C-alpha cells in the first residue's frame, strides 16, 4: 500500500502565481487522489481567497515584498520575514510534508528556505525567462527546477533543470466555447473583430490610462469590439470615464473576467502585460498578442519574456513608456490585418507546452515517493 503523500505548495500574490499553483495541485490529485496538499501564501493577498475557492486549505505568512525604491522602509519587511520563517517552521513541523513546491511570490521564499533547512526536498517553478533573486538562492538546495524557457542554465545548475513550461488554468482548454456564443456572453456582436485587453489580475495603470484616453477612438472604430478587464483598483475611474464618453455598444468593461475561456474564444487579438503565466496561455491558445511589459517588476523580467516571443515573430512589443502614443494604432492596425494575425497565431502556437501541470506533478510525486 502506498504511503499517503503530503505536499506543500507555496507562493502567490497575483493570479500569475496562483492559477499555475492550483493547476499543479489539481494534476497531483488526478495522479494521486490520496495526496494531502497544503498551500502556504501571504496574509492579505489574493491567494487567501482564490485557493480556498479552488478547494484547498491555505495558511498565510505575515510576509511582504521588499521596497526597492525606498530601502529604509524595509526594516519592517525584515521583521516580517523573520516572523514568516518562524511560522513556516511551525507549519512544516506540524504538516510533515515529503516535498515543498515554490511557484513564486512573497511566501515561497521563507517557506522553501525553511523546508530546505529542515531536510524537506524542494522543487521550484521558475515561470520567467529571467530568474528572480529568490529562485536563484533557493536553487542551491532545490532537488528540481521546472522552467519554461530555453537557456535557463545560465541561472541554475543544468542537472536540476526540467523543461516543463508553465501550467495554465485547466478550464481554458476544457471549456472553450464557440466564438459567437462567447461574444454574445459579453453582449457583443458575433460578426465583428474583437480585441481583449487585460492587465493581469490586479490591473495595469498604463494600459488603462491608454484605453481611457482612447475612448473617442473606440467610439469611432465601431466595427471593432473591445473586452476590457481593468482590475479592481482601476474599475471605478474607468467606468466613470466610459459613462462620460456616452454610448459605446462596441465596448464591454469589467473589473475581473471570471470566464477567461470565453474571453479568449471571443477575441481576435489580445493586449496584455507580459507575465509568464499569461504568455503560456497565449501560446497554448494560439492567440495573437500585443505585449506591453510592466516596468515595475524585478529584473525587468516582463520585457525579457516579451522579447523571447518577439525574437520568434510570435508577438508584438510596445514599450510601457510609449503605450499612450502607440498602443491603439498598433492594435487597430494589427487586428485589421488578417495575414499578420495568422502569422502571429502560427508562430506563438509553436512555443506551446500543453501538458505542463501534469509533468510538474509527476516530478513532485517522484520526489515525495523517494522520501517514503
Curated annotation (Swiss-Prot):
HAMAP family: MurG (MF_00033)
Chief site of localization: membrane
Top-level division of the source organism's lineage: Bacteria
A Gene Ontology biological process term: carbohydrate metabolic process
Name of protein: UDP-N-acetylglucosamine--N-acetylmuramyl-(pentapeptide) pyrophosphoryl-undecaprenol N-acetylglucosamine transferase
Catalyzed reactions per annotation: di-trans,octa-cis-undecaprenyl diphospho-N-acetyl-alpha-D-muramoyl-L-alanyl-D-glutamyl-meso-2,6-diaminopimeloyl-D-alanyl-D-alanine + UDP-N-acetyl-alpha-D-glucosamine = di-trans,octa-cis-undecaprenyl diphospho-[N-acetyl-alpha-D-glucosaminyl-(1->4)]-N-acetyl-alpha-D-muramoyl-L-alanyl-D-glutamyl-meso-2,6-diaminopimeloyl-D-alanyl-D-alanine + UDP + H(+)
Gene: murG
Subcellular localization: Cell inner membrane
EC identifiers of the protein: 2.4.1.227
Pathway in which this enzyme or protein is active: Cell wall biogenesis; peptidoglycan biosynthesis
Binding residues for UDP-N-acetyl-alpha-D-glucosamine: 14-16, 128, 169, 201, 257, 302
Membrane topology: Peripheral membrane protein
CC terms in the record's Gene Ontology section: plasma membrane
Signal sequence extent: none
Keyword entries, A-Z: Cell cycle, Cell division, Cell inner membrane, Cell membrane, Cell shape, Cell wall biogenesis/degradation, Glycosyltransferase, Membrane, Peptidoglycan synthesis, Transferase
GO terms, molecular function: glycosyltransferase activity; UDP-N-acetyl-D-glucosamine:N-acetylmuramoyl-L-alanyl-D-glutamyl-meso-2,6-diaminopimelyl-D-alanyl-D-alanine-diphosphoundecaprenol 4-beta-N-acetylglucosaminlytransferase activity; undecaprenyldiphospho-muramoylpentapeptide beta-N-acetylglucosaminyltransferase activity
Function: Cell wall formation. Catalyzes the transfer of a GlcNAc subunit on undecaprenyl-pyrophosphoryl-MurNAc-pentapeptide (lipid intermediate I) to form undecaprenyl-pyrophosphoryl-MurNAc-(pentapeptide)GlcNAc (lipid intermediate II).
CDD domains named among the record's database cross-references: GT28_MurG (cd03785)
Amino acid at each position: 500500500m502506498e504511503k499517503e503523500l503530503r505536499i506543500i505548495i507555496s507562493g502567490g500574490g497575483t493570479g500569475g502565481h496562483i492559477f499555475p499553483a492550483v493547476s499543479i495541485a489539481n494534476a497531483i490529485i488526478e495522479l494521486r487522489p490520496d495526496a494531502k496538499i497544503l498551500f502556504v501564501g501571504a496574509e492579505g493577498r489574493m491567494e487567501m481567497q482564490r485557493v480556498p475557492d479552488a478547494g484547498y486549505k491555505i495558511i498565510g505568512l505575515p510576509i511582504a515584498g521588499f521596497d526597492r525604491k525606498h530601502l529604509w522602509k524595509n526594516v519592517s519587511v525584515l521583521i516580517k520575514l523573520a516572523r514568516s520563517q518562524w511560522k513556516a517552521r511551525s507549519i512544516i513541523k506540524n504538516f510533515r510534508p515529503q516535498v515543498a513546491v515554490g511557484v513564486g511570490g512573497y511566501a515561497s521564499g521563507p517557506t522553501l528556505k525553511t523546508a530546505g533547512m529542515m531536510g524537506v526536498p524542494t522543487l521550484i517553478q521558475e515561470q520567467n525567462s529571467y530568474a528572480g533573486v529568490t529562485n536563484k538562492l533557493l536553487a542551491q538546495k532545490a532537488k528540481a527546477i521546472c522552467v519554461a524557457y530555453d537557456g535557463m542554465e545560465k541561472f541554475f545548475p543544468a542537472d536540476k533543470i526540467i523543461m516543463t513550461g508553465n501550467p495554465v488554468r485547466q478550464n481554458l482548454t476544457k471549456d472553450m466555447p464557440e466564438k459567437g456564443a462567447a461574444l454574445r456572453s459579453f453582449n457583443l456582436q458575433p460578426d465583428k473583430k474583437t480585441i481583449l485587453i487585460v492587465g493581469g489580475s490586479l490591473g495595469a495603470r498604463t494600459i488603462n490610462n491608454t484605453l481611457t484616453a482612447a475612448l473617442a477612438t473606440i467610439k469611432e472604430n465601431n466595427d471593432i469590439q473591445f473586452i476590457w478587464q481593468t482590475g479592481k483598483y482601476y474599475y471605478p475611474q474607468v467606468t466613470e470615464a466610459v459613462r462620460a464618453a456616452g454610448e459605446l455598444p462596441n465596448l464591454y468593461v469589467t473589473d475581473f473576467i471570471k470566464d477567461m475561456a470565453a474571453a479568449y474564444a471571443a477575441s481576435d487579438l489580445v493586449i496584455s502585460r507580459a507575465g509568464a503565466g499569461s504568455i503560456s496561455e497565449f501560446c497554448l491558445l494560439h492567440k495573437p498578442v500585443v505585449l506591453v511589459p510592466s516596468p515595475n517588476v524585478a529584473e525587468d523580467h516582463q520585457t525579457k519574456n516579451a522579447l523571447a516571443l518577439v525574437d520568434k515573430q510570435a508577438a508584438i512589443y510596445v514599450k510601457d513608456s510609449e503605450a499612450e502614443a502607440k498602443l491603439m494604432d498598433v492594435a487597430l492596425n494589427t487586428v485589421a490585418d488578417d495575414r499578420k494575425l495568422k502569422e502571429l497565431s502560427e508562430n506563438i502556437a509553436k512555443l506551446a507546452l500543453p501538458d505542463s501541470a501534469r509533468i510538474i506533478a509527476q516530478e513532485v510525486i517522484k520526489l515525495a515517493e523517494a522520501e517514503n
